[in-house]
C-alpha cells in the first residue's frame, strides 16, 4: 500500500490489526457523534491565504515548559500502545525522540516507565489518572520522577469510563471476548507473529510493577473499572503536588471556567480535549471549544489541544484557533501499527512537510505568527460562535 499522506495510515492499520484492536483506537463513545465532529469541525476551519511574503526562513521550532520542540507537536498518552507494535511504546518514543518532540507514556502502557525512559535522550512525559488506589498513584509518580520524566499530564475527564459500544461488537469486551480475540489474531498472522508471540509480556507494565504480578487484558479492564474515582476534585490535584514539583498539565478541559480553575490552581498547562470522542458523546469538539478557552486564559497558562488532528494542516488550524502545541493520538497509533518506529517517523515527517506548506501559503514564518488572523470566514457561511474570534466580554 502506498503511503503518501498521514491519512493513509488508518487504512493500512485496519488491514494489519485484529478488529478488536483497530476498533478500540478507531471508535468512540455512544453513537460516536463527537468522534466524527472532532474531525469534521476542524476540517471546516478556513485559513487565510497570503502571498509574496518571502518565506525562505520559515521555522517550526517552539518552546514549551523550558523544552525546545522541533515543531509544536507531542505524542499523546495512549493506553495499550504496546499491543499495536512489538514493545510499541519503546518504538514510538524513539521516533518522537529522533524528531525532537516529547513522547507521553500512558499509565496503562504495556511497557513500564523503566523500560521506555532509558531508550531516549530527551525527558519523557508521563500521564496519570486519579484512581482510588492512591498508593499506586504515589508509586507511579515516584517512579516517573526517578526515571527523569519532565512533565506530568494529569487526565481529569475520566472519573468513569465512557460507553464504548463498538468494543462489545469488536471483541474487546462482551460475550466470548477472549475466544473472539484469539480467532482474530489467527486471521492476522503479521500481527500475531510480531506482537502476539514476540511482543510479550502483554501486561500493563506500570500496574504490574506495583501489584507484583502480571496484568493481562482482562485484568486491565477489571482493574480500571474498579479504580476510576468519581469523587475526583481539585483537592486531589493538591495532593499530587506534594509528590510532583515539575510541570503539570491538566488534560480534558472543554469549558472556559474549568480552564480558569486550572490557572487558579497553578497548573502549568491544559489540554483542550474530549478524550478523542471516547468519553461523553455530544460534547463540543475540541476545535469548537478551543477559541473560547484561549480567549479566557491565553498567556496565563500553556494551551495544548488534541482530538481530531490527523495531519499537519490540522496542527496549523489548532494553533490558529488558540493552541500553543497539539497532541497526536490516533494518527500516530495508526502509523505505529502499520510500520512501527519507521511508520511513526514517516508520519512525523509528513506532518512537518504539511505544516510547512500551510505556513508558507498563509504567510506565517514562525509558530508565533499563526493566530486568529490566519483564519477567514468563508463567503456565504457564518462561522459558528465557538469558532469565531471572541472578546473578553463574550467569553465570560
From Swiss-Prot:
Residues covered by the FMN hydroxy acid dehydrogenase domain: 1-380
Functional note: Catalyzes the conversion of L-lactate to pyruvate. Is coupled to the respiratory chain.
Entry protein name: L-lactate dehydrogenase
Annotated gene: lldD
HAMAP family from the UniProt entry: L_lact_dehydr
Classification via Pfam families: FMN_dh
Any one Gene Ontology BP term: lactate metabolic process
EC number in record: 1.1.-.-
Catalytic activity: (S)-lactate + A = pyruvate + AH2
Residues the record lists as binding substrate: 24, 129, 164, 278
Catalytic residues identified in the record: 275
Family, per entry: Belongs to the FMN-dependent alpha-hydroxy acid dehydrogenase family.
One function term, GO molecular function aspect: L-lactate dehydrogenase activity
Positions bound to FMN: 106, 127, 155, 251, 306-330
Membrane-topology descriptor: Peripheral membrane protein
Cofactor(s) the protein needs: FMN
Keywords, ordered alphabetically: Cell inner membrane, Cell membrane, Flavoprotein, FMN, Membrane, Oxidoreductase
Amino acid at each position: 500500500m502506498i503511503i503518501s499522506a498521514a491519512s493513509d495510515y488508518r487504512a493500512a492499520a485496519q488491514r494489519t490489526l485484529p478488529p478488536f484492536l483497530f476498533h478500540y483506537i478507531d471508535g468512540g463513545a455512544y453513537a460516536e457523534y463527537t468522534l466524527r465532529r472532532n474531525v469534521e469541525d476542524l476540517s471546516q476551519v478556513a485559513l487565510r491565504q497570503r502571498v509574496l511574503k518571502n518565506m525562505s526562513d520559515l521555522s517550526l521550532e517552539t518552546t514549551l515548559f523550558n523544552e525546545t520542540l522541533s515543531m509544536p507537536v507531542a505524542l499523546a498518552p495512549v493506553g495499550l500502545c504496546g499491543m499495536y507494535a512489538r514493545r510499541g511504546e519503546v518504538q514510538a518514543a524513539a521516533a518522537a525522540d529522533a524528531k525532537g518532540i516529547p513522547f507521553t507514556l500512558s499509565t496503562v502502557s504495556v511497557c513500564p516507565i523503566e523500560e521506555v525512559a532509558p531508550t531516549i535522550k530527551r525527558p519523557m512525559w508521563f500521564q496519570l489518572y486519579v484512581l482510588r488506589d492512591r498508593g499506586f498513584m504515589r508509586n507511579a509518580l515516584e517512579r516517573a520522577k526517578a526515571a527523569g520524566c519532565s512533565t506530568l499530564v494529569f487526565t481529569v475527564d475520566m472519573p468513569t469510563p465512557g460507553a464504548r459500544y463498538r468494543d462489545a461488537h469488536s471483541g474487546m469486551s462482551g460475550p466470548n471476548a477472549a475466544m473472539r480475540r484469539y480467532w482474530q489474531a489467527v486471521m492476522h498472522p503479521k500481527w500475531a507473529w510480531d506482537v502476539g508471540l514476540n511482543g510479550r509480556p502483554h501486561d500493563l507494565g506500570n500496574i504490574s510493577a506495583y501489584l507484583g504480578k502480571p496484568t493481562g487484558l482482562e485484568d486491565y479492564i477489571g482493574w480500571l473499572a474498579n479504580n476510576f474515582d468519581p469523587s475526583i476534585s481539585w483537592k486531589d490535584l493538591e495532593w499530587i503536588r506534594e509528590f510532583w514539583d515539575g510541570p503539570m498539565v491538566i488534560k480534558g478541559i472543554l469549558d472556559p471556567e474549568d480552564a480558569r480553575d486550572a490557572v487558579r490552581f497553578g497548573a502549568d498547562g491544559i489540554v483542550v480535549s474530549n478524550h478523542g470522542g471516547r468519553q461523553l458523546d455530544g460534547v463540543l469538539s475540541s476545535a469548537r471549544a478551543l477559541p473560547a478557552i484561549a480567549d479566557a486564559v491565553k498567556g496565563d497558562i500553556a494551551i495544548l489541544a488534541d482530538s481530531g488532528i490527523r495531519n499537519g494542516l490540522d496542527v496549523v488550524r489548532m494553533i490558529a484557533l488558540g493552541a500553543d502545541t497539539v497532541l497526536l493520538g490516533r494518527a500516530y497509533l495508526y502509523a505505529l501499527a502499520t510500520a512501527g518506529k519507521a511508520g511513526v517517523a514517516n508520519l512525523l515527517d509528513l506532518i512537518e512537510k504539511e505544516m510547512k506548506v500551510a505556513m508558507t501559503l498563509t504567510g506565517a514564518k514562525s509558530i508565533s505568527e499563526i493566530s486568529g488572523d490566519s483564519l477567514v470566514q468563508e463567503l456565504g457561511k457564518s462561522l459558528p460562535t465557538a469558532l469565531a474570534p471572541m472578546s473578553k466580554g463574550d467569553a465570560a
